């Protein structure tokens, strides 16, 4: 089966990595809207329009399934995209919520949602978690992580300063952190390390990210078998510099 993966830039690599490892599909078309990244600072109307334009991009590729590997687009554009599509379109928020249900049984466990400004303001995660009975949910817009990751700044003083800026004011220490932006798993170890070091935690917080969650979701929803195919063929496209995108993919995905 040929599928599409859509993200604002390189963040979707975290989803793509999980898909490649699972080998659920034999061909993947990856489209990064790198000319207009980040999405997280844009207004909802603009994000919906970007989503519809991504649909137009995929039409000639004759894919059978589209994964919106962007939390902001999943929160604000997914429904509109589904209305205009004849193929199934899957976002990353629902799979993450299902992963929480499976892994977090304590409804009062403190959960922290990290995301872009647009994702957090949409309340998509907060509302979905409350519907599942989780009562102790807080959120934090950490949009500055996105341009750092797009520039391959995955460690060092600048990232440390950014984490200190966002995390120092926290009053409730989370047991669960939802990485509500597909860019964030690329710095997951740094986030975990920061909490362990600066908050003197005895055990690391549980990190939930949509890459692993979506594999499980797709297996269940579409009865797909893991490792049923040879290593998938991947084709990269971008609204910006596709050569740069391919270079980043080779570095991060070891292609």
UniProtKB/Swiss-Prot annotation:
Domain of life: Bacteria
Reactions this protein catalyses: L-glutamate = D-glutamate
Residue ranges of the TM segments: none
Known role: Provides the (R)-glutamate required for cell wall biosynthesis.
Signal peptide: none
InterPro entries found in the cross-reference section: Asp/Glu/hydantoin_racemase, Asp/Glu_race, Asp/Glu_racemase_AS_1, Asp/Glu_racemase_AS_2, Glu_race
Pathway assigned in UniProt: Cell wall biogenesis; peptidoglycan biosynthesis
Entry EC no(s): 5.1.1.3
GO biological process terms held by the UniProt record: cell wall organization; peptidoglycan biosynthetic process; regulation of cell shape
Family per record: Belongs to the aspartate/glutamate racemases family.
Species annotation: Helicobacter pylori (strain G27)
Binding positions for substrate per the UniProt entry: 7-8, 39-40, 71-72, 182-183
Cited Pfam families: Asp_Glu_race
Active site: 70, 181
Keyword Cell wall biogenesis/degradation: yes
Gene Ontology molecular function, alphabetical: glutamate racemase activity
Alphabetical UniProt keywords: Cell shape, Cell wall biogenesis/degradation, Isomerase, Peptidoglycan synthesis
Designated name of the protein: Glutamate racemase
Coiled-coil annotated residue ranges, if any: none
């Amino acid at each position: 089966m040929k599928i599409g993966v859509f993200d604002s830039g390189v963040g979707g690599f975290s989803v793509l990595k999980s898909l490649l490892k699972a080998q659920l599909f034999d061909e993947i078309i990856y489209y990064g809207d790198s000319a207009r990244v980040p999405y997280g600072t844009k207004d909802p109307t603009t994000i919906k329009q970007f989503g519809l334009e991504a649909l137009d991009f995929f039409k000639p590729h004759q894919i059978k399934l589209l994964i919106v590997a962007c939390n902001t687009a999943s929160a604000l554009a997914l429904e509109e995209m589904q209305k205009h599509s004849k193929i199934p379109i899957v976002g990353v928020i629902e799979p993450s919520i299902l992963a929480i249900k499976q892994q977090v049984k304590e409804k009062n466990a403190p959960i922290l949602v990290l995301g872009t400004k647009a994702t957090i303001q949409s309340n998509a995660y907060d509302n979905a978690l409350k519907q599942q009975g989780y009562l102790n949910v807080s959120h934090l817009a950490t949009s500055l992580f996105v341009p750092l990751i797009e520039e391959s700044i995955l460690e060092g003083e600048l990232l440390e300063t950014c984490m200190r800026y966002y995390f120092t004011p926290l009053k409730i220490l989370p047991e669960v952190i939802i990485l509500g932006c597909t860019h964030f798993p690329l710095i997951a170890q740094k986030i975990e390390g920061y909490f362990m070091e600066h908050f003197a935690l005895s055990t690391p917080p549980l990190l939930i990210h949509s890459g692993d969650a979506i594999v499980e979701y797709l297996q269940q929803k579409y009865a797909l078998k893991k490792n049923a195919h040879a290593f998938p063929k991947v084709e990269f496209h971008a609204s910006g510099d596709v050569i740069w995108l391919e270079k980043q993919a080779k570095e991060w995905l070891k292609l």
